[in-house]
Amino acid sequence: VRIKGAHHPPLGPGRLPWTQNLFATRVAAHVFLGAVKGGEPPPDVYFSGHYHVPGDSYDAWPTRALALPSWQLPTSFAYRLGADRPLPVGGVILTCDRGRYEVAKHFYEWQIRKYGAL
């Protein structure tokens, strides 16, 4: 199983719910076609983080792209950039065995709560 990863993906995501999986599909196409054009074997799986928007291209391209969620809840900086609510946090476990792989997603939603005075 060929795996390629980067903190900064080659493309930016849409931040709207209906564009999140399209982001992963665009990344899969970019990585697959870039490898083919460069005469390299394309990776089976490509993963990236940075944008904190989870997504999965599944089998849209021969390279499967996984856009990973954040590992922490939004900070004040994220809200200055326009975040309106926390996206899922978590990660992915990729298990490889004899040329096959399985993806186990561990994403968690956090409820927004109001602060209360004691």
Describe these PLM feature segments:
Residues H7-G12, Y108-I112:
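A short, sequence-level motif marking secondary-structure junctions
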Residues R2, P9-A104:
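Conserved beta-sheet core of the metallophosphoesterase superfamily
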Residues C96-L118:
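A short C-terminal boundary segment appended to hydrolase-like catalytic domains
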